[in-house]
A protein has these predicted regions:
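Basic amphipathic alpha-helical segments that dock to polyanions
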Residues: 47, 76-86
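Short helix-capping/hinge SLiMs at alpha-helix to coil transitions
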Residues: 32-34, 48-51, 66-67
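Short helix-coil-helix linker/hinge
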Residues: 36-39
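Pre-recognition alpha-helix immediately N-terminal to the DNA-recognition helix
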Residues: 41-46
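Non-DNA-binding regulatory cores of transcription-related proteins
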Residues: 84-149
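DNA-recognition alpha helix
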Residues: 55-69
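Short, Lys/Arg-enriched N-terminal segment that forms or immediately precedes the first helix
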Residues: 19-33
Length: 149
């Protein structure tokens, strides 16, 4: 885990991240004939508003504040499941939380650096790591299901 927030994520405009994520989501949904509902889009926006993972109940709280209505947990979980299925977000099991995926259209290892001071998360796609992991699996007759480094 990294402890230097500048290494994890430099200064930038988070609204650009949100806009780019929504644009990628719209494109992907169109290609897969899936519907990006307003609730799903808002949940995705919430997860991209910072580079910190959020739990489902944190997402629920923010969604309720944005809409001005009480949002039931199943509504949030359905949106999260949809976004996970399309690869638009990741679940971080070690934190029981979710974060936006900057590489939804590509096969990649889910390698995350997590700052222990501020909670910032950076995802890294490393093709050589994928290759090494697959080679190790092939040699040992394992099928890669998930990893935690």
């Amino acid at each position: 885990m990294l402890t230097n927030t500048r290494l994890v994520h430099g200064q930038h405009d988070h609204s650009r991240c949100v806009d780019a994520a929504l644009s990628r989501a719209e494109d992907l949904c169109q290609k897969k004939n899936a519907k990006l509902t307003p609730t799903r889009a808002t949940v995705l926006s919430i997860l991209w508003q910072s580079h910190r993972p959020l739990g489902a109940y944190q997402v629920q709280d923010r969604l309720s504040k944005i809409t001005g209505k009480a949002i039931a947990p199943p509504t949030v979980y359905r949106a999260i499941e949809f976004l996970l299925r399309l690869g638009l977000i990741h679940r971080l099991p070690s934190l029981n939380a979710y974060i936006g995926c900057p590489f939804p259209n590509s096969e990649h290892s889910n390698l995350f650096m997590i700052c222990i001071e501020c909670g910032c998360v950076a995802e890294i796609a490393d093709a050589s790591l994928n290759t090494r992991l697959q080679t190790a699996c092939d040699k040992t007759n394992f099928k890669l299901h998930s990893q935690n480094i």
